[in-house]
């Protein structure tokens, strides 16, 4: 999955969703219109997807393509998050990992982060785990969130009282961090944890 660019991934997802909804694949012009690119640009994406083995096309025939490798449940792993002190935000695509559909919330984007540190061990989130994050910009008290403060990202339990946000570790040996609410940006809520045994 590392071989797909972000745009190619989006084009492939669009093709899969279009086929599921309509029963036939989109035309080159429909792809171009959806992504606000030229038909030639759309065609180049299709050629790249074909070369990489994700679709098969029959030259010269409109709508003559089929998906040979689905990425519907492949979620981007976009780096590490510190379960400890804040860490500089690093969002770069490392890989795509297939996640069972039952873990995914319909209508939401998701991403994976690799956990570094031990501040969430009492919630059974350990160093080296992958956390599945549902992308959203809000949280309820007690939610485990990926949050950004001053350009740095951390994984903590979220609590808000008035205009103060507490980012609380799940480790009795560590202290909470307190911030003005406007300084805290919620990136998403943790909805799953994956661990290699």
UniProtKB/Swiss-Prot annotation:
Signal peptide: none
Keywords associated with the record: Autocatalytic cleavage, DNA damage, DNA repair, DNA replication, DNA-binding, Hydrolase, Repressor, SOS response, Transcription, Transcription regulation
Catalytic activity line of the entry: Hydrolysis of Ala-|-Gly bond in repressor LexA
Active site location: 119 (for autocatalytic cleavage activity), 156 (for autocatalytic cleavage activity)
CDD domains: S24_LexA-like
Superkingdom per UniProt: Bacteria
GO molecular function terms noted in the UniProt entry: DNA binding; serine-type endopeptidase activity
InterPro entries tied to this protein: LexA, LexA-like, LexA/Signal_pep-like_sf, LexA_DNA-bd_dom, LexA_repressor, Peptidase_S24_LexA, Peptidase_S24_S26A/B/C, WH-like_DNA-bd_sf
GO biological process, alphabetically ordered: DNA repair; DNA replication; negative regulation of DNA-templated transcription; proteolysis; SOS response
Annotated site residues (Cleavage) in this chain: 83-84
Residue ranges of the annotated DNA-binding region, renumbered to this chain: 28-47
A Pfam family it matches: Peptidase_S24
EC number: 3.4.21.88
UniProt KW Transcription regulation keyword: yes
PANTHER family linked to this entry: LEXA REPRESSOR, LEXA REPRESSOR-RELATED
Family (UniProt): Belongs to the peptidase S24 family.
Function: Represses a number of genes involved in the response to DNA damage (SOS response), including recA and lexA. In the presence of single-stranded DNA, RecA interacts with LexA causing an autocatalytic cleavage which disrupts the DNA-binding part of LexA, leading to derepression of the SOS regulon and eventually DNA repair.
HAMAP family the record matches: LexA
Quaternary context: Homodimer.
This protein's name: LexA repressor
Gene it is expressed from: lexA
């Amino acid at each position: 999955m590392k071989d797909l660019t972000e745009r190619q991934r989006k084009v492939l997802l669009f093709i899969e969703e279009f086929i599921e909804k309509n029963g036939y694949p989109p035309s080159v012009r429909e792809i171009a219109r959806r992504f606000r690119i030229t038909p030639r640009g759309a065609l180049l994406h299709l050629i790249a997807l074909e070369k990489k083995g994700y679709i098969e096309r029959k030259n010269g025939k409109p709508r003559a393509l089929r998906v040979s490798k689905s990425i519907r449940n492949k979620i981007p792993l976009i780096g590490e998050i510190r379960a400890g002190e804040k860490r500089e935000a690093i969002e770069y695509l490392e890989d795509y990992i297939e996640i069972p559909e039952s873990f995914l919330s319909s209508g939401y984007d998701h991403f994976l982060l690799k956990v570094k540190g031990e501040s969430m061990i009492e919630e059974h989130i350990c160093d080296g785990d992958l956390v599945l994050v549902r992308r959203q910009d809000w949280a309820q008290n007690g939610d485990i969130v990926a949050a950004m403060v001053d350009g740095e990202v951390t994984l903590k339990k979220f609590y808000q009282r008035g205009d103060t946000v507490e980012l609380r570790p799940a480790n009795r040996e560590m202290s909470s961090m307190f911030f003005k609410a406007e300084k805290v940006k919620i990136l998403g809520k943790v909805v799953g944890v994956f661990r290699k045994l």
